[in-house]
């Protein structure tokens, strides 16, 4: 049995990435303050349909995701269908895979096309760190349920007497892993220490990311893949990412204090991604349907793979596990790739994965391979800057990476590109795209 992955439908047609778009990415509580993930999702899907001149009624499936869930609209995908002029019978469901969420939605739509169930679908994701589901304490939640059953004033008074002042305080969403209590920042700190990644190297990678992202915006390359977002009540707009450090100076990074290990740490706010708001989406079609409708795809999915590892140690090493699987399924080696796009959750996590790509010991002990994945050529790596600069709305990053690498490959005359990311819960993803 061949190890090669056949990302085609029954007719042998490839899965075409027809178009992609995202909102600008904005730091928490700035341009998108008060705008929900759902509203950003509707915003970007509406604009994507308008720009592609695709009749919304032709969309057969929409798979969308978010990580920070909205209790009022748990199925964000269905709400987007109902809010963007698509046929009400359009299949729609929501997914979540932490920072790999829109990779998952992309794969789900692609697999629906591969099985022949649909020919056209939309995938993507959105997240807001500014509109959060603020909860209540367990004691208050328990009391509120009991209040619904209490009949007399005396019974209600007895319930209130069980509560202390601290029980009334709001509870923000958790930033730590449910199973370990560790935050991703703490894991990044652990990886920096385990693999001897210096503060200087982390700051240098962050500086590189911001510098390249700033140059990319100045070149105009992102104008066709980032929409102008008009913010309700439509008196303001945002037309570019607002986390990028223009005229980044390497020496300035050293001024920041460690964020997670105050005494001995090296992970800072400057070499980590900030909490970010934003949304992204892509249109997928069977190759034949895209051709029939007159579209020139920006790329095709060649292979993909997901991975899962332990959450106590090296939780953010997902790219090092998923990438060799995707390469094997594509029949490729790392050196065959034209471009490599790795999600930069933290500089420490990114550098640790790059180190493991080149490690024979890691390949033998963790992957069961007799040779390393390969040493990354920096002339191919995150050439437009990465998440450290652009920001990271959790569910939106995957389809940002896919669109960005496809369009950059198109500018370069074609080739193949790897997109890969770590995700909370010890998850990882890698997807290889090809562009003609």
Swiss-Prot record:
Subcellular localization(s) per the UniProt record: Cytoplasm
Catalyzed reactions per annotation: an acyl-CoA + acetyl-CoA = a 3-oxoacyl-CoA + CoA
Pathway noted in the entry: Lipid metabolism; fatty acid beta-oxidation
PROSITE patterns: THIOLASE_2, THIOLASE_3
Class in the EC hierarchy, top level: transferase
SUPFAM superfamilies: Thiolase-like (SSF53901)
Active-site positions on this chain: 99 (acyl-thioester intermediate), 392 (proton acceptor), 422 (proton acceptor)
Keyword Mitochondrion part of the UniProt annotation: no
Family: Belongs to the thiolase-like superfamily. Thiolase family.
Designated name of the protein: 3-ketoacyl-CoA thiolase
Taxonomic source organism: Shewanella sp. (strain W3-18-1)
């Amino acid at each position: 049995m061949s190890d090669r992955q056949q990302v085609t439908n029954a007719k042998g047609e490839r899965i075409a990435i027809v178009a992609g778009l995202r909102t600008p990415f904005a730091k928490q509580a700035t341009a998108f303050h008060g705008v929900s993930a759902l509203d950003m999702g509707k915003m970007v899907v509406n604009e994507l349909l308008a720009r592609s001149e695709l009749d919304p009624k032709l969309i057969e499936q929409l798979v969308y995701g978010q990580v920070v869930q909205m209790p009022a609209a748990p199925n964000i995908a269905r709400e987007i269908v109902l809010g963007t002029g698509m046929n009400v019978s359009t299949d729609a469901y929501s997914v979540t895979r932490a920072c790999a969420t829109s990779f998952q939605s992309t794969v789900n739509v692609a697999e629906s096309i591969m099985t022949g169930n649909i020919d056209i679908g939309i995938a993507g994701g959105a997240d807001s760190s500014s509109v959060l589901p603020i909860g209540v304490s367990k004691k208050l939640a328990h009391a509120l349920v009991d209040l619904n059953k209490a009949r007399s004033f005396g019974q209600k008074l007895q319930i209130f007497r069980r509560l202390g002042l601290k029980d009334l305080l709001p509870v923000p969403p958790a930033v730590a892993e449910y199973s370990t209590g560790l935050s991703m920042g703490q894991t990044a700190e652990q990886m920096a220490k385990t693999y001897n990644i210096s503060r200087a190297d982390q700051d240098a990678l962050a500086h590189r990311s911001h510098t390249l992202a700033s140059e990319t915006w100045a070149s105009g390359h992102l104008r066709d893949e980032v929409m102008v977002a008009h913010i309700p009540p439509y008196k303001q707009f945002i037309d570019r990412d607002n986390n990028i450090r223009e005229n980044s100076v390497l020496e300035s990074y050293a001024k920041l204090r460690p964020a997670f290990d105050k005494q001995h740490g090296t992970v800072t706010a400057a070499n980590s991604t900030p909490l970010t708001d934003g949304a992204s989406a892509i249109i997928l079609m069977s190759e034949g349907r895209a051709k029939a409708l007159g579209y020139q795809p920006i790329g095709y999915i060649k292979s993909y793979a997901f991975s899962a590892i332990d959450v106590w140690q090296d939780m953010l090493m997902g790219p090092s596990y998923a990438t060799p699987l995707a390469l094997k399924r594509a029949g490729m080696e790392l050196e065959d790739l034209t471009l490599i796009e790795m999600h930069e959750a933290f500089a420490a996590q990114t550098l640790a994965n790059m180190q493991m790509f080149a490690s024979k010991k890691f390949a033998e002990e963790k992957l069961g391979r007799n040779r390393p994945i390969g040493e990354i050529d920096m002339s191919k790596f995150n050439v437009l800057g990465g998440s450290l600069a652009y920001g990271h709305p959790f569910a939106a990053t995957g389809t940002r990476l896919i669109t960005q690498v496809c369009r950059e490959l198109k500018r370069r005359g074609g080739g193949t590109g790897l997109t890969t990311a770590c995700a909370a819960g010890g998850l990882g993803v890698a997807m290889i795209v090809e562009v003609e």
